[in-house]
Amino acid sequence: MRKKRVITCVMAASLTLGSLLPAGYATAKEDSKTTPSYEELALHYKMKSEKISSNGKLVEIEYVSGNETHKVQMNGNDHTVKVDGIEQKGLNFEYDENAANRTNYENNNLKSNEFTTQAAKPKKGYHYVGTLSGHTKAAKNALSVTMSLVGIVPGLGWGSKAATILFSYWAKEQIPDAYYKYDLYEKGAMTDSWYQYATVQFFEDKAHKKKMGKPWTSTPAKVDLPNS
């Protein structure tokens, strides 16, 4: 009981560290000693530019830190995420045209609660960027699963909800790992009013058939440009 209280306190402290920015499964460093993973870029670098193709299926992001620059490519055609050409194994990107259309309808006052993760209607003024999914690596308990998600999920306020879901599974000793899926939304890209948020769902299986708890929508978080 004492051990559980200690772990709970550690987790509570970890969830107050600040916003959780978009990122992915960290595997690039296995392929390169100099190229950071997508997760590391999101945590320690700033976005300098973002380019989205006309059909939405190719997203190119440039991250910078000092004189260091790295390029991320999210490809909805082959579902890969790459950093400087190195594939981020375990992290997938897809562009759901139906989700994009629903966002446009919502911005035109369509009354619908339907979209990829089934959490809530898209927030007015935001547009759908894409859906990222991945795997948190095998973990011994809910704390390690939650900590492995730091840097993965964009937006604010998801931590306590994730903890509630994961601790309930930990109590039943049912979480060797966890799969996640989130829809990314943004508005004001490349401006001083650039915000992003996500709708998130955990799963027990890679096929995303066995849901872990209910999905939720994070609170929008501001994206700071390098000179801001």
UniProtKB/Swiss-Prot annotation:
It comes from the Bacteria. The keyword Signal applies. Keywords: Signal. Residues 1-28 form the signal peptide. This is SPbeta prophage-derived uncharacterized protein YomL. The gene is yomL.
